[in-house]
Amino acid sequence: SESIIDDVIRSVTADCLLANRSSEEARRGLADYLEKNLIINEGLGIKARRRKIAALIGPTGVGKTTTLAKIAAQCVLEKGISAALITADTYRISAVEQLKTYSDILGLPIEIVYNAKELKDAIQKFRTKQLILIDTAGRSQYNRRQMQELKELLAVNPNIEKHLVISATTKEQDAK
């Protein structure tokens, strides 16, 4: 929020003025401040022999599909985790093709689902995978019908973790 940004600016500015630092030292000071004060999420927290199902949800255009592909790549290429992709984003032009391209590159199976029953079947199909990543269509929190559709879709399995993806420039009042 803006108050956090103000605190960072005050702290780093005061430190730089008191120490008469150069711009490079100021950058390092900012990096040190952020490192000490930011909480870094450890990701999806995938544990051995425990399956994880994660759905990325959020408004249109925030990068859910790209984020999903990056998570999949990191899990598969760096950690050797067995994974599968599911897309329920059949609304955006080329969304399915984009995810199919990622699945081809990573050698991952992919299913395209149009409703809750198909999602349930796809999750069952991938039951041996350690990680199942679900891409969803962009939804506005102000559109009750869209929110209800998303809720019904993800209700097929109580183990689906919902991860909200929003733009870094989203205003605090819009995120509520």
Regions found by a protein language model. Give the residues of each.
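Primarily NTPase-proximal linker/entry elements flanking Walker-type ATP/GTP-binding cores
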Residues: 2-62, 66-83, 87-90, 101-102, ...
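Conserved catalytic-core segment of NTP-binding enzymes
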Residues: 84, 96-98, 105, 114-125, ...
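A short, aliphatic-rich alpha-helical micro-motif
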Residues: 48, 126-127
